[in-house]
Amino acid sequence: MSYEVEMKFPLPTAADLDSLRERITQFGAIAHEPLDQRDLYLAHPSRDFVQTDEVFRLRHVGEQNYLTYKGPVIDTETKTRREIEVAAASGPTTAAQLLDMMTSLGFRPVGEVVKRRTPFHLWRQGHEVEIVLDEVHGLGWFVELETITDETGRVAARECLFELSRELGLGKSERRSYLRLLLGDDPHER
């Protein structure tokens, strides 16, 4: 079973962003091309994902489509949760068909997050860590630290990210999702 261990931090100014980019590369992280991502979040027909702390989304990265399920967060300091992501066929026709299938099954769209993501990768303490700089429409800039691990590696992965966040000089992490931040603290208001 795979678990995503994640920490997210807001970046208040452009100077913070430039300084962080420099620090990331000093750690030997390898930069990759920026990606445009569009995430459509779906509500389950008979389960309140806000109450169960689950996520189901359709993600578009360029022409590629992904369906992702994230289970409840199981850590009080990071966003550690089970994650299942399945790549689907590419293209807008497939995206429309996937959405049609989901809505036919009773799922309904509840919100969309659009971002430009610049990923960096590095190996640290035996973990492949992805550091991403996200420019989220309507929210601004954030940095995420993320790694995927199995159940036995969760504690070590968490400590790896804590140490990296301290060394990068990141402040207090933001545990709310981009969708929750965009919708406000109470998603039932919309």
For the regions a language model picked out, list residue spans one by one:
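Extended, acidic-biased charged interface segments
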Residues: 140-149, 160, 164
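N-terminal strand-loop-strand beta-hairpin
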Residues: 1-126, 162, 168-190
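Glycine-rich, acidic/polar active-site loops that bind/position phosphate-bearing ligands
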Residues: 156
